Amino acid sequence: MKPDTLEFEELDRIRIRLIILGGVVILIFSLLASRLWYLQITEGQKYTEFSQGNRIRLVAEPALRGIIYDRNGVILAENRPAYQLQLIREDTPDLESTLGQVSQALNLPFAELNEKIKASHDLAQFKPIILVDDLEYEKAMYLETFQDDFPGVSIVVQPRRFYPKNNLAAHLIGYVGIVQEDWKELPEEKRSSSQIVGHSGIELLENDYMIGLDGGRQAEVDHMGREIQVLGKPVASVPGEDISLNLDIRLQKVATEAMQGESGAVIVMNPKTGEILAMASFPDFDPNLFSGGIDQKNWNRLLANPEHPLENKAIQGLYAPGSIFKVVTAYAGLAQGVITPQTERVCNGYYFIKGRSAPFKCWKEGGHGKVNLIDAIKGSCNVYFYNTGVGVGVDAIHKYANLFGLGKITGVGLQNEKAGLIPSSKWKKRIFKEPWYRGETPSAAIGQGYITTTPLQVINMINILANDGLWMPPSLFKDQQGLQPQQIPLKDEYLSLIREGMVAVVNSEGGTAKKVQFEEFTVAGKTATSQVISNKTLETLDDEAKASKIFQNHAWFVAFGPAEDPEISVLALVEHGGGGSKAAAPVV
């Protein structure tokens, strides 16, 4: 082959390669141009918004929660400034390093800070995470001074719930806490790690009114997350509504001091209006522990307490009412014609019933002798009411107990109020598939056996009795609207007889609460001692176990006065306090 021919062939191969290479280059540039067109034109608005999102921040202005007052304007729950240590992940290039710096500089446990981050994994990257809810002032000022060293971390002053009376009325007032577990159920724009809601008591019941409306502003921020300028017109937050209670914190304090550290409940009401003037449950707790999220140590301590400090025993505690229930049995006996005011029974200390070998005993060894209705109420004679209860039967007892408001919630509005239990023959057949036995009625007649009530139900019953059968619904709020008083179909003459017996309890010789009579006005009252275990079980215990406090009876006392025109009613329950006249009556 000639040399010229070889040169032409080589040039052709080079030319082909250049054409291919040029095509590839053109293809690449075409793809790049197409992508640039897509990014700048088709998706331009989207990425412009992304870019602006890196420098424009929506800064929330939390609404101030409504203040809770007592009936005299004393503040029970308010707001105070708290220095929140917040972190925005979007503004934190090296999260772990920043957390380490914060931990070291402010002497905060790294593990706890990291746990806060993990717990907020569902929160949007641009939303703040609260690392510390209420940082000490000195630490807050240090971080403010050296903020450049902590990218994405800032100090934000936020309102924090504060309870100036600490433990006083804690169960009634309730407490607030941070919402975290319900984030996924909220729209993205409403998710916030600082959302505060009521968790119990009035704080929960009135949460929708007290929470207010958050405001906010759009602000331009620098690369450190610091505000440069406000964009547009800020939206002001709207404070929540204030709440005024019927509670008198002075009475609440007196009730707390009177209990002297015992476990139980105290309630003070106005029977004419239904106003709750005091409601105390013991042991109590400090609601301030929950304002910024309770720590694990305090939470475990509250849960481990065998006396259940988080339970509002006034509405959630279920107890046999004991001898206070005798007012129901007395009314049932009068209404059913089983007894009259003059009916007398002989109490020799025990009562036999057919088919049962062991007698039902009276609390007074040797008995009360011959007693009529007034005497039986005054001395709390079990035998008199055993007879009366068996005479009317369990279903009549059930009927009149319901009329007095037992066996159903009072409707006070507080969460988890218990209804208690007033048994009937139908109830036992439904639950146990057994008939009601006559031998079960004596226990029911004196408020034992299956019967359980809450302290609020018991004082509600006494208010109906004191108020001539007019039921005033329990009222928590000052000037509360929508309450519907109800005249219960009870005969005045029977109610008057029972009130006479209750006056004798406090003011006559032989009365079970003679030691607590008042000089200022005449008081009507009733003591009660309710068993926590049966006599049969008690007999199986040794002396040391019998002496244990957990096996001691509960002590009740309820009173109203002045007896002829009641303006106040008081109930005291002392758990495992022993006799009502010894433990509960002195509280009142």
Kindly label every feature range from the protein language model.
Residues 2-8, 77, 221-232, 272-323, ...:
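Beta-lactam-recognizing serine transpeptidase/beta-lactamase-like catalytic domain environment
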Residues 1-296, 318, 338-340, 346, ...:
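Periplasmic/cell-envelope proteins involved in peptidoglycan metabolism and beta-lactam response
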